[in-house]
Amino acid sequence: MNIIVKPYGNDLCYCRPDTTWERENRDFYSPECVNEIHFAPVVFARVSKAGKCVGKKFVERYYDGIGCGVLLYGAPEASCGSCRLISHIDRSSILPSPLYNPVVLEDGEKVFDINTGKDEQISIVLEQAKTLLEDAICSSSELISLRIGDFVAVELEPARLLAGRADGEVSMKGTFCENEIFGFKVIL
């Protein structure tokens, strides 16, 4: 199982391994070599049919559930060389379940709210989410064979700083369709 990610403002995609998927809403403990944790809000879909080079006409047949979550990135110490952000840290892909029926994205008025615990509230209106997801499924399937159970995630905003080592501990909560979908602490 892969988590295929389309970064914000980029036409290419990359894969995160399944070890990055956080299923149980547990607290995130940062590795010692990471000085900062950044996050990017995402909308994601679960692939329900294997395929390659999926066409726009048939893309709705290839996913059966959607959701909202966040991807965590680690900013390494300066000694790590040319790495800007680390995307393969275990349990750093917060893609909660249960998933929603894709029909919820059709009205374009659903809101994904994130509270970072630092008096910062982020509200994202998902007006183009269905189009973004379907475009990402089509474009990523040109490079990667989709398998049943894969996730395709699209970053809705550029990654931003969540916490630094000096912050110690920060909480993060997310709501979608007026339901709390995740809540955890990031401990540096």
Regions found by a protein language model. Give the residues of each.
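Catalytic-core "active-site belt" of small-molecule-metabolizing enzymes
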Residues: 1-151, 158-188
